[in-house]
Amino acid sequence: MSETSCVNATVAVVGNPASNKGKGAEVGKQVVELLQEAGRKHGFNVIDVTGESFDDSLANARNRRNEYDYLVAVGGDGMIALGANAVGCSGKPLGIVATGSGNDFARGLELPVNRVETAVDGIVGAIVRGTHIDVDMGLATSLQGGYAVDSSTGDDLVSDSDVPLRPAVNRFYAGMLSCGLDASINDRANHSRLPNGSVRYFVAAIVKLTHMKRYGYHIKATLADGTVEERDIISPLLTVANSRHIGGGIEISPYSRFSDGLLDLVWLDHAPNVAECVDAVSHAYSGKILGCKVFGWKRVRDIEITRAQEGDEPPVLMADGEYVGRLPVKVVVQDRALRVLVPPAVAESQAANTEEKVLEAIKRDHRDPVTGKTDTYYAKRSR
C-alpha cells in the first residue's frame, strides 16, 4: 500500500480520561497531538472520540464508526477491549498505545509498552505502509440466568429508581476471560488504595493466594478436533485465553496464538501445595508454566460455563481487566475478527510463531495436543 492511500483518511483516538487518577486524559491528549503532527505530513485527519467515562467512550467509538477509518485506543488492556468491541468484525484497523499497568495484550503482540512516542510512530508507519495482522477474539454471551454487571465497578446494574437490571452479556475480548482466582485478584486490586498498579496487583495476589477458594464450574466444550467434552471442574482458577499473558507478564497460556481459530482453557486441577506453587512461580515468565502438572489445559472452539452443584460461587467474570458479568456464559472463538495495526517487524514475528512451534512446546511439556492430558499420550507414542 502506498503512502498516498492514507490521504484524507480519518484516525480516531479513544482513551479513558478517568484512568490513573486523570493521567489518562493527559496521555490521550499527547497521542492526539502526535497523530495530528503526523497527519499534517501524511495527509490524514485526526478526531478524538473519548467520552467522559469508559462506557461513554465505547458508545462514542461505536456510534461514530462511520466517521473514521482507523481507531487508536490509548490505555491498558481494558481500553484494548473497548477498541475490540468498537471495531471488532468491521475490518477497521485498531492501533494500540499501551499505557496501562498490565498491557498484556500489547506485550503478547510485542508492541511498545508505556512508550507513547514509539507506539505512535509504529501506528503511523503501519497506516502509511498498510501493515496489519488479523487476530482472533473471544465472544462471551449470557446463557439463561447470566447477566452483565457494571464494567467499571463489577456491581449489579440498577435503574434510576433502583430497580435491578439484568442485561445479557454480549462482549468481545482480545486477551483473557478470567473466571476464578485471576478475576478475584483483579477485583481486589481494583479496589485497593495502594498507589502503584503493579504493587496493587502483587498485594492482591498474595491475599487471594493465601485464602484460595475452590470454585465450582460445569463446562461443555467443543475441542480442537470437534469432539465435545462435558465435566465439572472444581478449581481456584479457570481462564479462557486468546493471548498468552496475564497480570503484567505472567505467561499463563503459553500455547496461545493470536490467529489459530482456537481458545485455550487453563485451570488448576487442585489447590496447589507449597512445592507446586514454587514450581509454578519459577516457570511463570518462561513460557513453561503448563509443564507444571497442577495445571489443566485444553484447546477449545467454544465453551459453555455454568455453575456446578459443588464448590464455591465463582466471582464476577472479568475480560481484559474489565468486569463482564455473572455465570452462566458461553464463549465462542471469533476467527481473525480484529484487525490490528502493527509495524512490519511485528507482523513478521507473529507469522513466525507457527503451529509447529506451538506443538513443539506442547510436546516438551508432555501434553496431548487434543485432550491436554499429560504423560500418557507421549508414553503410548514412544512404545
Enumerate the language-model features and the residues they cover.
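A residue-level signal for conserved active-site and pocket-lining positions in enzyme catalytic cores
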Residues: 16, 77, 185, 238, ...
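ATP/nucleoside-binding phosphotransfer catalytic cores, i.e., glycine-rich phosphate-binding loops
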Residues: 3-6, 24, 221-232, 251-383
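Glycine-rich beta-strand-to-loop/alpha-helix junction loops that act as flexible
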Residues: 17, 74-76, 97-101
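ATP/NTP phosphate-donor binding region
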Residues: 1-74, 81, 85, 121, ...
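Short, glycine/serine-rich, charged loops/turns that create anion-binding
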Residues: 18-19, 101, 181, 244-245, ...
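Short amphipathic alpha-helical segments
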Residues: 25-27, 83-87, 107-109, 251-252
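Catalytic core of DAGKc-family lipid kinases
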Residues: 12, 36-38, 45, 49-51, ...
